[in-house]
Amino acid sequence: NEAFSRAFVGLMRTIAPDTFIFCMGASATYGVAREMGQPVVREFYADRGYNLDGTIVFARSVNRFDNKTVAEKVVRACREGKVQTDDGEDIDIGFESICVHSDTPGATELLETIRAALKANGIAVAPVSQTG
């Protein structure tokens, strides 16, 4: 919602102008933050499906994922900048951060699997402040 994003980013510009906002690249918040000069980081949601427009599939309940499959999805997104949507189509995806939600069953183990897969594929993990 653009009106909410403008209010939120405007408030952030007032109280925390150097604080990163983490959000979907395909969101109004991302566009508004860039327009208003607020530091913004696009997130890749490892534990969520994607729609054709690059937004995530919102689920009322989160199922346990196959950790290896999710890790492969993350590695592919890092290497190729692509993710397969829930419709089976590949879309471009740009991001600077990888998110796993804490309410995802087995989130800790999933993160460990993702981290190991990134390391095995020579993909560095670094603080956002060091990603350029």
Label the model's feature ranges:
Residues 1-13, 28:
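N-terminal active-site wall of soluble small-molecule enzyme domains
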Residues 17-19, 38, 94-96:
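Short, well-ordered coil/turn segments that N-cap beta-strands
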Residues 13, 34, 119:
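Anion (oxyanion) recognition and catalysis
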Residues 100:
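Conserved, mostly hydrophobic/aromatic
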Residues 109-132:
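C-terminal domain-boundary segment and adjacent tail
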